[in-house]
Amino acid sequence: GHYDKYVERGIPVDEKFALSISELTMEDWILTFKLDITHPIAILIERTIAKLKKQGNYNITDIISSLEKDEKSDNQTKNAATGLFEAADTWGVFEREGQDPTKIKDLINAGTTTVLDLSVYNSVGAFNVRALVISLVSRKIFNQRMDERKKEEIAAISKGLDYFSEQEQKENPLVWIFIDEAHEFLPKEGKTIATDALVQVLREGRQ
């Protein structure tokens, strides 16, 4: 969403960045929109996302269309929910129609430092977009590394080798994640959308 603006201003950039909206969970949206789980808007969003996930990949346009067609909620609730997703569409963080979302393998290369500039995304005010991005990227990096670790252990066992002494180059190596102002996403009280993902990385990420 901000790539073209950077190019126009002569700011060095390498690749576009875009998240797949279908990877967000119901809890992600509740935390992002700061809703109570029992609020009518949250209930409508939960029902809508659950239905769309059964269909596979979807985008914001699909979400808005499904919200508008909901027969269980009143117009005021549907308009409010639709407005939230129309706002999300302006964040410049989700893939557009015809655009492929960023893959984790594009961000991770052994011996290479990848900088993901989140300064263009809002972290204060109504929506914490930076926390949303950090949550999804951290979660995907962690899950990919866990899957790779299982493959490495199975391969080591099949070779009759000690997994921990094996020094082969890993296809998906261990990743160091450095987050500027990380305390903003791990508050002493309460939580952000990034809190659970970061806590999991802190507890289990050494693998």
Ranges and model annotations:
Residues 1-203:
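P-loop NTPase motor domains
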